[in-house]
Amino acid sequence: MEHKKRLSKIVTTIHIEPYLAEYAIRQFNHHSETDAVMFPPGSCVYCTVWENMARPRANASTPAQEGNLTIFLPSRRAGIDGGKWKDPAYFNYLSPRAVNEIEAELREVFNLDLRRTILKNEKERRESKEKRIDVVNRFMQQYGLTAITEDALLKNYARYINRMSPQKPRKYRKKLQD
């Protein structure tokens, strides 16, 4: 019984964008007993979760665990540098600001993965002749994304390309009449 009680304390549920939750569930490993998402140690999302873990306030009531992503809280031991060790059974609270930071990190990982997939296809386009929309559809099927459309992902990629290499507007000149 003690093991189950501890397991229930070291997982938390957060509410983020539905497509990011679907992506995280398919992309990262799951804890076998709790079915919670486990982020790999050393990843930016893992570090963000660990940095934002806090003790719940004594006078705060326990919030209902509602959300679309259940996270297995990281457990880092104090290393050579003498850093703090946060026991996830006690440091199991994530503030709304922390949830926003975790969501931003997950969005960054998602966008990086999507862009890497599309750019890889662009590089090999001469051989495969696969259209961008087909690559995006395959990406969506790979991660089981139903909460976002292909058009939204293509628009996201187009914004990224425009931001990385903006087009210079053409300068018009009047013709001089002779």
Segments (PLM) and residue ranges:
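Generic detector of leucine side chains in alpha-helical contexts
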Residues: L7, L20, I25, M53, ...
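K/R-rich mixed-charge low-complexity regions
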Residues: E101-D178
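Short helix/strand-capping turn motifs
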Residues: A89-Y93, V99, E103
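Membrane-targeting and insertion segments and their boundary/processing signals
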Residues: K84-P88, N92, E124-E127, K131
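Short amphipathic alpha-helical surface micro-motifs
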Residues: N52-A54, R97-A98, D134-V136
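Long, low-complexity interaction regions most often at the N-terminus
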Residues: M1-F91
